[in-house]
Amino acid sequence: MGKNKNYNKNQFKKSKTNNDTTVAQQQQTIEEKPDFKIDGSILEGGGQILRNSVALASLFNKAISIEKIRYNRDQPGLKNQHKAGIDLMSRLFKAHLTGCSVGSCKLYYQPTQKTIQDDGVIEADTKTAGSICLMIQVSLPCLIFAPHSTKMVLGGGTNCDFAPAADYIQNVFLPIATTMGFKCEMSIDKRGFYPKGGGAVTLTTQPLTQPLSPITIVNKGEVNRIVIKSYFTSPRISPLVAERMNNTAKKLIKKDFKKVDVETELIDVSKFSFGDGTFIEIRAYTDQGCIFGATGNGAIGVPAEKVAEDAANSLLKDLQDGGCMDEYLQDQLIIFMALAKGKSQIKTGPISLHTQTSIHITSLMTGAIFTITPLTNNTQSGEETNLITCEGISYFPSDLNNNNNNSNSNTTTTTTTTTISTTTIDNQNSEEK
């Protein structure tokens, strides 16, 4: 066992003053005094900093300023898909928002209401092939704590590079995350491929009756089922392309999992897509309830075999690393672990830069204490395994408490107030775009 690393502190500094005064929405003049000033260039240095900080600022009704947004990217500043997510949150929480324009490297966000109002169906659209799932990531932590059910219809890209696929959220993330006690259903109504976008996803949630339960995923077990699905749009794209993807992925996976049943399926989504495209989804299930996922998007000039190889190799690496989840799931669970009541533990492979970033932002804004414990290496690939432990803050907003009291609930819950402290961390840059 290695030495524990505590992440209950952060280099970010709580802001005391900010003399900038701007004209707010609806012609109101608001003095911008952020509770937190966040350096958007640290660690992963990308959109995840925006999504986590805006989500938590909304939950805790705190004002934030973010500077150096995506500062080390080839094209710094906000992209349209980031702007769409922040605009969505601004509408949900009637926020005072400045600097939220494409290319902006600085923004200020201050929610003016403490919860999402029941105003009917929530609609948002990236207007491009920008990722729908990035809008889900920023909004879901808040939607599940709304005092009423919610329905959200989102437009944009469903299968995008540098973002989770809608299939991954639906088939990997949600089945695992909802074991913490929240109810969320998702449907992919229309596929939106790059570069046209035009996809549609519907997300519904039900109000919680108690804080999130902690999550424990420490026993991987044995892989007992693998599913490979390749999607295509006919007649522009032949089913033979999707079949080549399936065959390539299955051949690679069977080398390591000879005795495991590998299911394959070809799916024509031409009637449910805007534009043409191909996509491969691979999932591995274990006898202990773990789910691993990998995806790949077809592209002009890229052989179908290459798309399948990359997805299959990504899945195989995660399975060989010895953790109980793939590298993409680990960072997406962090914010929910922090908000839960009690101690959560997840066993992972190497700690990704996205996970480090999520831990730092979440620790800063919630006060939740994270510990990363390196575990004895027992994997085929020689990679490290780690145990991420979090003492959650038992977050439960007062309006949900009131709802429960009004319905004579026997559940007793409280909202925990936390104290935030700061420390210094190494500044690292990510090559991700």
Swiss-Prot record:
Catalytic activity: a 3'-end 3'-phospho-ribonucleotide-RNA + ATP = a 3'-end 2',3'-cyclophospho-ribonucleotide-RNA + AMP + diphosphate
Catalytic residue positions: 354
InterPro entries registered for this protein in UniProt: RNA3'-term_phos_cycl_insert, RNA3'_phos_cyclase_dom, RNA3'_phos_cyclase_dom_sf, RNA3'_term_phos_cyc, RNA3'_term_phos_cyc_type_1, RNA3'_term_phos_cycl-like_CS, RNA3'P_cycl/enolpyr_Trfase_a/b, RPTC_insert
Role according to the record: Catalyzes the conversion of 3'-phosphate to a 2',3'-cyclic phosphodiester at the end of RNA. The mechanism of action of the enzyme occurs in 3 steps: (A) adenylation of the enzyme by ATP; (B) transfer of adenylate to an RNA-N3'P to produce RNA-N3'PP5'A; (C) and attack of the adjacent 2'-hydroxyl on the 3'-phosphorus in the diester linkage to produce the cyclic end product. The biological role of this enzyme is unknown but it is likely to function in some aspects of cellular RNA processing.
Annotated family: Belongs to the RNA 3'-terminal cyclase family. Type 1 subfamily.
Pfam families found in the cross-reference section: RTC, RTC_insert
Organism of derivation: Dictyostelium discoideum
One example GO MF annotation: ATP binding
Positions with biased composition (Low complexity): 1-10, 401-425
Biased composition (Polar residues): 18-28
Gene Ontology CC annotations of this record: nucleoplasm; nucleus
Protein name listed in UniProt: Probable RNA 3'-terminal phosphate cyclase
Annotated positions binding ATP: 137, 328-332
Protein's GO biological process: RNA processing
Entry EC number(s): 6.5.1.4
S-adenosyl-L-methionine keyword on record: no
Keywords: ATP-binding, Ligase, Nucleotide-binding, Nucleus
Subcellular localization: Nucleus, Nucleoplasm
Stretches the record annotates as Disordered: 1-28, 400-433
Gene3D superfamilies linked: RNA 3'-terminal phosphate cyclase domain, RNA 3'-terminal phosphate cyclase, insert domain
